[in-house]
């Protein structure tokens, strides 16, 4: 795309160089050529030339008005002032319609066919779509045609020339955009902090749970070991009675024997 725009930029520079040494009818003819030239869609540098501005004082003031219209205006503006402006050639008319599409695209991302037909003063949908396709091929807009819903969906459009009086509004818009970006950034930072805090809390809780599980396992293991020892001891006591209980009958027998002996 950049490669396609370079020849147009060079062409505009050539027109500007030619215009610097031109005046009168030669200058108006040059302006007409610029307005017809393929790929040339910005005219601010040409408008800033002193000899071009001098046209406002003479009989060719209408050409300066027409150049201003191509720089900042739209096709409806031309129709509204048609009586005081030079007649457009077919190429100039198509270019001004292209610029009108760009102006609409800068305000709306989905442009209804009905709006385009009205502003471009067209009745035939096929001709409208052909005009849009021409604008796409010249790289002044990018988008697609939604024929089912009769919309032009815009992805990109070039910037048009800017009036000096509009600069303050542009600066204000940029400041508002920057403020909006800062607000979004602050919101993201707060979400990151919350996410990190949640992660930290979750990690701490997980560690506590793991520690409790480990303690419970140790307790269960110790309890199981103690129970096993008690059971073994009980079994051992049942199988092998204490020696003290086995010796008691022997003592009794000894006493009996003593009594028997004393009687004899």
From Swiss-Prot:
Domain PCI: 2-159
Main location: cytoplasm
The organism's place on the tree of life at top rank: Eukaryota
Compositional bias segments (type: Basic and acidic residues): 235-248
Biological processes, Gene Ontology terms: COP9 signalosome assembly
Localization terms from the record: Cytoplasm; Nucleus
Compositional bias (Polar residues): 223-232
Any GO CC annotation of this UniProt entry: COP9 signalosome
Matching SMART domains: PINT
Coiled-coil blocks: 194-237
InterPro entries per record: COPS7/eIF3m, CSN7_helixI, PCI_dom
Keyword match Nucleotidyltransferase: no
N-acetylalanine: residues carrying this PTM: 2
Record's keyword terms, sorted: Acetylation, Coiled coil, Cytoplasm, Nucleus, Signalosome
Region (Disordered): 223-264
Family: Belongs to the CSN7/EIF3M family. CSN7 subfamily.
Function: Component of the COP9 signalosome complex (CSN), a complex involved in various cellular and developmental processes. The CSN complex is an essential regulator of the ubiquitin (Ubl) conjugation pathway by mediating the deneddylation of the cullin subunits of SCF-type E3 ligase complexes, leading to decrease the Ubl ligase activity of SCF-type complexes such as SCF, CSA or DDB2. The complex is also involved in phosphorylation of p53/TP53, JUN, I-kappa-B-alpha/NFKBIA, ITPK1 and IRF8/ICSBP, possibly via its association with CK2 and PKD kinases.
Subunit structure: Component of the CSN complex, composed of COPS1/GPS1, COPS2, COPS3, COPS4, COPS5, COPS6, COPS7 (COPS7A or COPS7B), COPS8 and COPS9. In the complex, it probably interacts directly with COPS1, COPS2, COPS4, COPS5, COPS6 and COPS8. Interacts with EIF3S6.
Protein name: COP9 signalosome complex subunit 7b
Organism of derivation: Bos taurus (Bovine)
């Amino acid at each position: 795309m950049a490669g396609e725009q370079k020849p147009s930029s060079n062409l505009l520079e050539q027109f500007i160089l030619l215009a610097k040494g031109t005046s009168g009818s030669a200058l108006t003819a040059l302006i007409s050529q610029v307005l017809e030239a393929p790929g040339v869609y910005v005219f601010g540098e040409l408008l800033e030339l002193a000899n071009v501005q001098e046209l406002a004082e003479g009989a060719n003031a209408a050409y300066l008005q027409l150049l201003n219209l191509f720089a900042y205006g739209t096709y409806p503006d031309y129709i509204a002032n048609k009586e005081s402006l030079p007649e457009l050639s077919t190429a100039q008319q198509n270019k001004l319609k292209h610029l009108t599409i760009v102006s609409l695209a800068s305000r709306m991302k989905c442009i209804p066919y009905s709006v385009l037909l009205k502003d471009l003063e067209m009745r035939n949908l096929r001709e409208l779509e052909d005009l849009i396709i021409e604008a796409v091929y010249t790289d002044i807009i990018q988008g697609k045609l939604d024929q089912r819903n009769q919309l032009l969906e815009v992805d990109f459009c070039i910037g048009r020339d800017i009036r000096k009086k509009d600069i303050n509004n542009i600066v204000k818009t940029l400041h508002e955009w920057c403020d909006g970006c800062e607000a979004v950034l602050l919101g993201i930072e707060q979400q990151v902090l919350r996410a990190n805090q949640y992660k930290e809390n979750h990690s701490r809780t997980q560690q506590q749970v793991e520690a409790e599980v480990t303690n419970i396992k140790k307790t269960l293991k110790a309890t199981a070991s103690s129970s096993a020892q008690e059971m073994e001891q009980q079994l051992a006591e049942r199988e092998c009675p204490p020696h003290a209980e086995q010796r008691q009958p022997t003592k009794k027998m000894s006493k009996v024997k003593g009594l028997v002996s004393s009687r004899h």
